[in-house]
A protein has these predicted regions:
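Arg/Lys-enriched, amphipathic patches
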Residues: 1-110, 120, 124-125, 153-156, ...
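Active-site-proximal segment of RNA-dependent polymerases
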Residues: 134-155, 162, 209-218, 225-226, ...
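Conserved catalytic palm subdomain of right-hand nucleotidyl-transferase polymerases, strongest
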Residues: 100, 174-181, 230-239, 280-324
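Short, conserved micro-motifs composed of acidic
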Residues: 399, 447-474
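Basic, alpha-helical interaction scaffolds
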Residues: 1-14, 20, 463-506
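Catalytic palm subdomain of template-directed nucleic-acid polymerases
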Residues: 309-326, 362-363, 414-438, 453-462, ...
Length: 506
């Protein structure tokens, strides 16, 4: 009878296996050198070939180890260069080291334990439950979009073939989760561990039985800028274990099939057949039209929103209510909420895990399913804006007389809104933002948000709008989805960001 597969034993086995020892390599190199200089006998020749093969095998393992550590894919087919991989891994490690941060009292701390305490307190507060205000008001009159045919897709039973296909779609050497194993192990030894993996995954997907240990996650902190000083300057990225990634990916593949029928065309992120360039082109043409509008009494404005920690602030009750209102099957909703709400995680600081945080709100960044769930939440924001447009409270911007009026463009959490520059429409935008923020948990950072006015708007008329919105006025948005929004005569200045990005890679 085959012995049951144990994750604890597997973890212990992985921990005992380290990268090739430098001392062993030196001994083999010395042995090969001595044999090459020795008398040319058949016995010496056999020993020389055996030692050379052993040395080559160890050097190959060392190269693979450092290639995985360095996370470099663009030299995959190049010459062997272990020293390069080693230097890249060391460079990444130095860049990702946290040498100090400022705590809530603005005091600089540089001891690892103190940094860990600051990080733990910050994320415990960030992922704690806030009040769920005005949810019913926000979700009222929300029509079911999930048809009976669409319901059949997430409701049908899952299969072993589906699970295996998802595993082999994963990048084999992507960053491992808390159990220190990436997808390559499961792909390589599928004939050994496959049945056990399938049993665990199907037990949850088909019956809802969740092993909470599977949902333990490491959070790594990626700096947003060159000189991060506060925890808000770091982006938390989840490193889940492979079993849980399989569960999420299988469910995401089902949801992806019906997503285009649920998400508004103004949202281009992660939806099949939609491109980021669609939003870029529409935004560029709309802003260019506003820039060229020199005459007329009616002005227009574009509002670029900065949403603070968009994924981390999503309220679970809001997400659950959204799915019920859209008409998803109850069993599917229970599986999703089980994935979302059974999470626990530790923060990795300089290679070591600290704390055991159990959140009560927020969605993890890095999970494919949660990307789609965030779009379902953002759908309500789109619906509120569309309803305001249909009721005549919001008119947006039109490029020409018969062109459709554009009120908003969304890409993930990147939002660009358009309206007429008058008191009524500005108030409508403000009310909509307040309603959506209160019910969903989203926090609009008005200090980092900005507004751009059409050229026919006089400066004196802009002041009231700026005061009502509480944002800064700009001559042009610096960029939208990584590309310039307006291109004038100063081409060098406009495209200087391309040069900067190239230099960062060199």
């Amino acid at each position: 009878m085959r012995r049951a597969f144990k994750f604890e034993e597997l973890l212990a086995w992985v921990s005992s296996k380290t990268h090739p020892d430098a001392e062993t390599i030196k001994k083999l190199q010395k042995q090969v050198e001595e044999l090459s200089m020795a008398e040319q006998t058949e016995e010496n020749r056999t020993e020389f070939l055996a030692a050379s093969k052993k040395l080559d095998d160890i050097l190959l393992k060392q190269e693979i180890y450092w290639a995985q550590r360095s996370q470099i894919a663009w030299l995959k087919h190049g010459d062997k260069n272990t020293k390069f991989f080693h230097s890249k891994a060391s460079q990444r490690q130095r860049r990702n080291m946290i040498h100090g941060v400022r705590d809530q009292q603005n005091i600089w701390v540089d001891e690892v334990e103190d940094i860990a305490n600051v990080a733990t307190n910050y994320f415990e507060n960030l992922f704690s439950l806030g009040s769920c205000d005005r949810m019913e008001e926000c979700l009222e009159a929300m029509q079911h979009k999930v048809t009976p045919d669409m319901k059949e897709i997430p409701s049908r039973d899952y299969s072993a073939e589906e699970i295996k296909a998802v595993l082999f779609q994963m990048g084999p050497t992507k960053a491992p989760g808390p159990y220190s194993m990436n997808a390559l192990f499961y792909q390589k030894f599928w004939h050994i561990v496959g049945d056990d993996v399938i049993a665990v995954v199907l037990d949850f997907l088909n019956s809802g039985n969740m092993n909470f240990e599977l949902n333990y996650t490491n959070i790594v902190l990626i700096p947003k800028n060159k000189s991060p000083e506060r925890m808000s300057d770091y982006r938390p990225i989840s490193l889940c274990n492979i079993i849980y990634k399989i569960i999420f990916k299988v469910m995401a593949n089902r949801l992806k099939q019906i997503l285009p029928n649920l998400i508004s065309p103004t949202q281009s992120a992660f939806v099949p057949s939609r491109l980021i360039t669609d939003n870029v082109l529409v935004a560029y043409e709309t802003l260019h039209s506003m820039h060229c509008k020199k005459k007329g009494k009616k002005g227009a404005l574009g509002l670029k929103l900065d949403i603070n920690k968009a994924y981390d602030r999503v309220k679970w009750a809001f997400l659950e209510k959204i799915m019920y209102n859209l008409g998803f099957p109850e069993a599917w909703i229970e599986r999703v909420m089980s994935c979302v709400s059974t999470l626990s995680f530790s923060i990795r600081i300089n290679g070591k895990a600290y704390g055991n945080i159990i959140p009560t709100t927020g969605l993890r960044q890095g999970d494919p399913l949660l990307l789609y769930l965030f779009l379902l939440c953002a759908k309500r924001f789109t619906t509120l804006l569309t309803r305001a447009k249909e009721e005549g409270r919001l008119h947006g911007v039109s490029l020409c007389r018969r062109a459709p009026r554009i009120t908003h463009l969304l890409f993930d959490d990147d939002s660009l809104l358009f309206c007429q520059a008058n008191q009524e429409e500005v108030q409508c935008i403000t009310d909509t933002l307040q309603l959506y923020a209160a019910s969903s948990g989203q926090c609009i950072n008005f200090e980092k948000s900005s507004v751009y006015f059409s050229s026919n708007m006089e400066v004196a008329h802009r002041e009231g709008t700026i005061a009502a919105l509480g944002v800064k006025d700009v001559e042009s948005f610096e960029s939208y989805l990584g590309l310039p929004t307006l291109i004038g005569w100063a081409k060098y200045q406009t495209f200087s960001f391309l040069k900067d990005q190239v230099w960062k890679k060199i």
